[in-house]
Every structure is written in C-alpha cells, then in structure tokens.
C-alpha cells in the first residue's frame, strides 16, 4: 500500500507493508491494525495474520519533550504527537543539538525508530553524500547518561532508521 503524506509535494508518499492473506473464500485481505508498529516475521504459514503483532507498544506518544533549540514553530512536542505531517527542527542542525523524551516512568524499550524530515531541503534527487549521524543516550534519573546507539560515523541515508535493541532496555529518558 502507499500512504499519502503530501507535505512537501502533492504526490509525496510512503510505502506501507501490511500482513496479507486469503480468507476461506479466496478473498484477499490485509491487517492494517498497528501498521507502523514492529511485526513478527513468520517463519512459515500463519493461520491468523493478527498473530504477527509483536505486542510492543509506542512508549513516547504524548510524552514530555525538551530540546536544545527549535526552528520557528517546529516545536519539540511534534516529535511525540504521532503525526507524519509534523516534526521538530533544531535551530542550527549543527553538532551539539539534542532532544530529550521523558517516558514518565521506568519503561522497557525494545526498539527505537527515528524519522527524519527533509526540512529546508532543496535537493530533488538522491544525494550519495547526505546521511544521518546521531547518538542516542538513555538515563534512569535524567542526570547520568549511557550510550545506547552510536551512529556518529554513519555514512548511509537512513531517513526512517529503525533500531531493534539486542536486549530490552529499562529506562526513563531517551
């Protein structure tokens, strides 16, 4: 399926992949529930495609956010509003800008996804020299931070980077 975004351009789209099967009458159907959440990949035939849901839930929705800066009206709270059409932008885009999300309690984090938006981009074709570099830290108390993900040397374009952690992480702040 294609998901319409149409924020930068009227035909701007994203690809959506949903579990699909045939019912007893041979009619094809898809399960789009929790369509942007992690799904289990079946290793064989599945009797009920609803069983592909991992059970992992979005922990950041509507949670408090702080940032080093913001550009114009692109407020940090946009990061946790779960809208594909809103986003946060730091004022400069230079190293040292940061964003912090409070999960408002100790939570078990199993995966992290960052979705970048091409704010103020003027490039129309794929640029091989543009890529996303970042680090993700976590903290239980908001004072002592440990590195979770290090993509500071990344040389790939990852506008929707999904990182599944090797082990679940108990944390309060990211």
Where are these regions (language model features)?
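Disordered, acidic Ser/Thr/Pro-rich linker "stalks" and the adjacent N-terminal cap
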Residues: 41-106, 117-129, 150-153
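Beta-rich carbohydrate-recognition and catalytic domains
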Residues: 3-47
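Extracellular and analogous surface-interaction loops
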Residues: 99-110, 165-170
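A short, structural micro-pattern
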Residues: 11-14, 59, 130, 170
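Predominantly extracellular/luminal cell-surface or secreted proteins
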Residues: 3-5, 68, 115-117, 137-139
